[in-house]
A protein has these predicted regions:
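Patatin-like phospholipase
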Residues: 1-355
Length: 355
């Protein structure tokens, strides 16, 4: 990563601050955009204008859900000693020089507030640390987390307080992060706004088409094409079970890919046996052939019509809003008393009579 970014190894690892640019990184730190007290006003947050903003998806196996990295929460800590097995010394030096120990976390025991032990679950003499402010986080941390995959690359361990335990028994647990594709293999929604101001594109790796085996790169030709998803035809019990797994894993992507406002900016690159995926022993010729298809996919997008795309997105957004507003209008009369009463953060479920 440092070599690609043009950084001298003596300058330290590539950080998110390098990508943001010096001015944007300073604004990020000043506004504390990665903290709970960050300003909510879009006008204030709009002062942060990075030259390049990188986000990655990673899957938390312990909490069985995906997360965006850099994290938007401060609940995950790392152990400097544990991470010696995962990252080189200069990456850990950057982390340790810019991070800090977490503030005390307490729980009530016998009527007294008692601090939860924040020492590593494996190294009892080492305190865990919070990740530094996002501009100071090495990019390789997110890359390593999002690329982890069972058997091939080890998952990355963090630690977090388990608040699901009973009061008095809460403490740190190990929390494992692996490949973001375990939860969503095509998170193009990462980059979307309801009404886009800039185009975003995706390349989707798929199987060859049965009727067009020689067409290795494909993009729908117009608004009326690509309306239906590819059928997953199976004729055996094994195929059925495979379809069950694929549906559980890919149903979100399956709904998005043929949707209006999505399919016009997605190019299929079709891969055969021995290409892509978990094939780690591809020949240089195979890799070059895949690279050529990637070039062709980019060329398919050269005639992308952003005006047409914005019109389609506007129509779908307005249609969705109309449907939502109609439902809100129908229910609004019954919500008046609750809205006037306001929100009670300390409200206990099941205590309606107390209100």
């Amino acid at each position: 990563l440092d070599l690609v970014a043009g950084l001298d190894p003596q300058d330290g690892p590539l950080t998110f601050g390098h990508l943001y640019g010096e001015k944007a990184a300073a604004v990020f730190r000043e506004l504390k955009l990665d903290e709970a007290a960050a300003p909510a006003s879009p006008l204030v947050r709009g002062q942060f204008a990075p030259e390049l903003e990188l986000q990655m998806m990673t899957t938390c196996l312990t909490f069985t859900r995906p997360y965006v990295f850099p994290f938007r929460t401060k609940v995950f800590f790392y152990c400097p000693q544990c991470w010696q097995d995962y990252f080189p010394a200069r990456v850990l030096k950057q982390l340790n020089d810019t991070s800090s120990e977490p503030p005390p976390v307490t729980q009530k025991v016998d009527g007294q507030q008692v601090s939860i032990d924040l020492h590593c679950v494996h190294h009892r003499d080492v305190s865990v640390r919070m990740l530094p402010s996002v501009p100071d986080i090495p990019v390789v941390i997110g890359v390593r987390m999002s690329l982890s995959f069972p058997v091939l690359l080890s998952a990355v361990p963090f630690q977090s307080v388990d608040f699901n335990r009973a009061v008095g028994k809460r403490g740190l647990i190990e929390v494992w992060f692996s490949d973001g594709g375990l939860a969503s293999n095509f998170p193009i929604h990462f980059f979307d706004a309801l009404l886009p101001t800039r185009p975003t594109f995706g390349i989707n790796l798929t199987d060859p088409h049965p009727d067009h085996p020689d067409e290795l790169v494909h993009r729908p030709s117009g608004n009326a094409s690509g309306l239906t998803p590819r059928a997953n035809v199976f004729t055996s019990v094994v195929g059925f079970l495979g379809a069950v797994y694929t549906t559980m894993h890919d149903w979100v992507d399956g709904m998005a890919l043929p949707a209006p406002g999505f399919r016009d900016r997605i190019v299929d690159v079709r891969t055969g046996d021995g290409e892509g995926g978990l094939n780690l022993k591809m020949t240089s010729e195979t890799i070059e052939a895949l690279g050529t298809r990637g070039d062709q996919a980019a060329m398919e997008l050269e005639d992308f019509d952003f005006d047409n795309h914005r019109w389609v997105r506007y129509r779908t957004a307005m249609g969705g809003l109309s449907e939502s507003f109609a439902g809100m209008l129908a229910a609004r009369a019954g919500y008046g008393p609750f809205i006037e009463q306001g929100y009670d953060a300390g409200y206990a479920f099941g205590s309606q009579s107390a209100r």
